[in-house]
Amino acid sequence: EELRRILNSKNEAIVILNNYFKGGVGKSKLSTMFAYLTDKFNLKVLMIDKDLQATLTKDLAKTFKVELPRVNFYEGLKNGNLASSIVHLTDNLDLIPGTFDLMLLPKLTRSWTFENESRLLATLLAPLKSDYDLIIIDTVPTPSVYTNNAIVASDYVMIPLQAEEESTNNIQNYISYLIDLQEQFNPGLDMIGFVPYLVDTDSATIKSNLEELYKQHKEDNLVFQNIIKRSNKVSTWSKNGITEHKGYDKKVLSMYENVFFEMLERIIQLENEKE
């Protein structure tokens, strides 16, 4: 209800980026699960797959019927209009599918100013925002024109990371990258927080790293209390689509639900601080 009030007062979508500069942190799966849950909870959402590999699109296609858009994502960016690049998955859920043609984007924007290049997606999303409650962007795990575009177009960034040494050290670099773009082009950008992704739940090293992560961010409370643990169920869903009636379905789904609701709670808190 509180979220509904905030969305009504904004009259336009809240844009969330799900991103980190490292693959294998469960990023696209998190986006897929959020798409599934937003649909389930009657939020009107546009998912944007700004990834050449189109991982999110392929994953969503296992659960929803995904058709090809009239105009692919790259052509939409090139033409300056994304309306024809949107496909409808359900009454609530829309998608701009990823396409390998996105690899042509750096060539298209090569002669542009850095500002115009970085603002491209933000500019083209502006007229679509009033149609949705949330817009969730999934993009490549590397510094690139794709990521810059996504960061500049977003209100919030959510950072999935593996609870292991290496990831925690890279956090600072990633945050500096965000701050750099925020200061130049997107002063309203905020971090929702880090979602820990555990590959091996029994490893003592990972447990101590996770504790360390919570300790480091005790003051700013940036680490989600709810975490994602790797599960075979998710691999099954990636093959056959998301189900809710088979063994362990509910348990794994509720793990994602908890993260989803914590994300919404954090957004509500941040939005209220702005008012």
Question: Whereabouts are the PLM-identified features?
Answer:
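P-loop NTP-binding core
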Residues: E1-E275
